[in-house]
Amino acid sequence: MRVKITLACTECKQRNYNTTKEKKNHPDRMETKKFCKFCKSHTLHKETK
């Protein structure tokens, strides 16, 4: 079952992206490098509740 998650910037703590993930295949919190429009650079984004 796919669940909705929110990705937050680790620099400015803004929640920039909404996406889905397969909980069974990826039980850990997701981390990815994405563009933050508030920081105006590519930063690490982590999954939030």
Curated annotation (Swiss-Prot):
Keywords of this entry: Ribonucleoprotein, Ribosomal protein
Gene Ontology biological-process entries: translation
SUPFAM superfamilies, per the entry: Zn-binding ribosomal proteins
Gene Ontology cellular component? Answer: cytoplasm; ribonucleoprotein complex; ribosome
Q: Which Pfam families match?
A: Ribosomal_L33
User: What is an example of a GO molecular function annotated in this UniProt entry?
Assistant: structural constituent of ribosome
Q: Does the record's keyword annotation contain Cytoplasm? A: no
UniProt cross-references to NCBIfam families, sorted A to Z: PRK00504.1 (NF001764), PRK00595.1 (NF001860), rpmG_bact (TIGR01023)
Spell out the family assignment given in the record's similarity comment.
Answer: Belongs to the bacterial ribosomal protein bL33 family.
Alphabetized PANTHER family for the sequence: 50S RIBOSOMAL PROTEIN L33, CHLOROPLASTIC, LARGE RIBOSOMAL SUBUNIT PROTEIN BL33C
Protein name per the record: Large ribosomal subunit protein bL33
Q: Which organism is it from?
A: Lachnoclostridium phytofermentans (strain ATCC 700394 / DSM 18823 / ISDg)
